[in-house]
């Protein structure tokens, strides 16, 4: 491929879009996967008002907008808005012409097949890209950690999944996915605040709660102990958060009660197993000979794994589940928020990958279903 045709890597998360150029060591732009539309009619004649705002601009004007996320649980639910997000990514953030660059997109495992077909169709027909590829998020995270064997526990805003990979081969029968992730924790946090008498209801206020969650939440090593401590010595746990209007809000036991749902989903009324059990079940679906290596290479990835103590707590929970002689090792790379993107950057700049792209010709010959044949 010629020098100017450097690939674009776009990791479309349910919560954030991470995008940049292949070969870079970090994404060039990261913005929320949000499309906002004005709630009120505009009466200021001459005021430049758009019918919709994307990403940070929507975030900044959120007070007057209704915000929508076009991706829910890793699946695109609104393709028109998704197109706007991609348009914003290429033209406003990266400032490139997509028709000149191959594009690598990412997707959660066990997604409906139509999702990636539609992605392929939009890339070739709307953005006219010369070539594209869709890769599974967890596999890219493993690339980024420099391993070829391990079980990736990826938890983002919309979906969490555990994917065992052995010597570079994904074991599809052992993939587990739970549709519980960061966004569910944000909603849970809103509920916890309501119990305290702080109501956050609008889509804009939800973003404030997300910020509180990201800045102040942590995972308790022992949930019951921590609850006891928060009742007896609440001052040790409480933190003050300043709201955009200058009011102060005290955040106490919510700090660990909110993310505890990752290990105990019944707290938010979900029947799915916790992250540790999901990972354990994935390992148990694998061949008995490779389990030891998987236990020893549990790799965290995604923004919802950024809580303090998550590695230690997961190690503790996995130790309780695994055979007593088993050595458990949880790897929590500091850049794990972006490890999917970093893995995509590594993959798309490998010389051996260049024959993997789906080209425009192949698309024109076979249509969108080509994506199932050429991408895992």
Swiss-Prot record:
Record: residues binding ATP:
14-16, 18, 157-159, 213, 303
What this protein catalyses is: ATP + H2O = ADP + phosphate + H(+)
Gene Ontology terms describing biological process: symbiont-mediated actin polymerization-dependent cell-to-cell migration in host
Q: Does the keyword Nucleotide-binding apply?
A: yes
GO MF term set: ATP binding; hydrolase activity; structural constituent of cytoskeleton
**So which domain of life are we looking at?**
Eukaryota
Q: What is its subcellular localisation?
A: Cytoplasm; Cytoplasm, Cytoskeleton
Q: Which family does it belong to?
A: Belongs to the actin family.
Quaternary context? Monomer (G-actin). Oligomer (F-actin). Polymerization of globular actin (G-actin) leads to a structural filament (F-actin) in the form of a two-stranded helix. Unlike for mammalian monomeric actin, monomeric actin is able to induce oligomerization with ATP or ADP. Mg(2+), which is used to coordinate ATP, is required for polymerization.
Name-wise, this protein is Actin-2
Gene label: ACT2
